[in-house]
């Protein structure tokens, strides 16, 4: 998945703008929406943008993405559960997914690792893995859905994020939980608070009955079965409760921030 390049279209040729927007847009659903006949007038109505000579396809994509985020957030039902499956349905082998090879995944020493918790919380501190392992944990067998079009079913065990947020005295009126990861390029991702408080959103420490493998995000990933895979950050090293939208690795490249599955 490559980075979106800037594209300015002099004179705003309508067919060219829609063609380039279709090619640049990463989400297949939105790509089909534009390719299926969305006119510039419709896009202007939806995004609130006035298409002018200086308007770029990239800017149009940002506005459509912002609109989509708002719609998805509005219709999100915090009480609706992602489907669960029997353990017999687990995908074997469960695929590794990343923008780098598995041998280049972060190799973290769990004895030295700590989860830094900061932002709008009463209890700002760094949690050791041993401390986190002592928290109550639950298992879920849910489907991981990748933005690239494939899916796989896995078994994940960990602490519900909403329970941890309550434990640290997080201000759950805040807009986001923002996660920083140990990936080579400094992967990070925001999670809207409604999704963070969903009962299935989990701080994951195990895959199956084993400690979370390196390939799947050791020592901790955030499992969000109601969202696409890139919204499930791995190798998490810090969590911040905030009202500020700080962007994210893929979000900054044009992917929807909400990205419900």
Predicted ranges, named:
Residues 1, 10, 35-36, 47, ...:
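Feature targets compositionally biased, intrinsically disordered low-complexity regions
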Residues 1-28, 39-42:
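N-terminal secretory signal peptides
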Residues 4, 8, 46, 51-55:
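Short, aromatic- and cysteine-enriched interfacial helices/patches
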Residues 17, 51-261:
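Structured, non-membrane catalytic/scaffold regions adjacent to prosthetic-group chemistry
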Residues 26, 32-52:
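N-terminal export signals
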Residues 30-31, 221:
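Short, cationic motifs built from Arg/Lys/His that form the positively charged side of catalytic pockets
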